[in-house]
Amino acid sequence: DLIRELKARGLEVTLYPFVFMDCPGYPWRGRVAGVDGAGATAEMAAVFGGATDWGLRRMALHYARIAAEEGADGLLIGSEMRGLTWTRDAAGGFPAVDQFRTLAAECRAVVGPGVALSYAADWSEYFGRQAEGEVLFHLDPLWADPNIDHVSIDWYPPLTDWREGEG
């Protein structure tokens, strides 16, 4: 009902589900990472899971159904999963990015063309992965996917000058 109420007031609504870590220390979701190498593809498939598993896929599809039923304007299929999107398989590919592309297609099938879809990269993730002397723009295939409508970047700029003193 809230989405419909906000829309009735002339506002646009984007659903932005967050993954919070429910373990001691409550680490940032961007620290969840796979292990580079031969097992990375299977590992990312397990993290995303199926539509009825308790993985990222089930969560995103749940919110896609809400977006479709309630008339949301947009849906972020994930956010700040830097550790996952940087994980590389044995061939140097990025299996979590492949999973997000598949997930975008699955969400598109639920919400249709009228709901804008994207993945919100962390400010330290969006510009690529820098390692072993190379820069790889790992998210480009996701953002260029026909099921993704725009580039989204989470950025938390300071609202005030936090330094002490005048000036």
Give the ranges of each region predicted by the language model.
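Glycoside hydrolase catalytic-domain groove-lining segments
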Residues: 98, 102-118, 141, 145-167
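A short beta-to-alpha transition loop/helix N-cap that caps and shapes the active-site region
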Residues: 127-129, 159-160
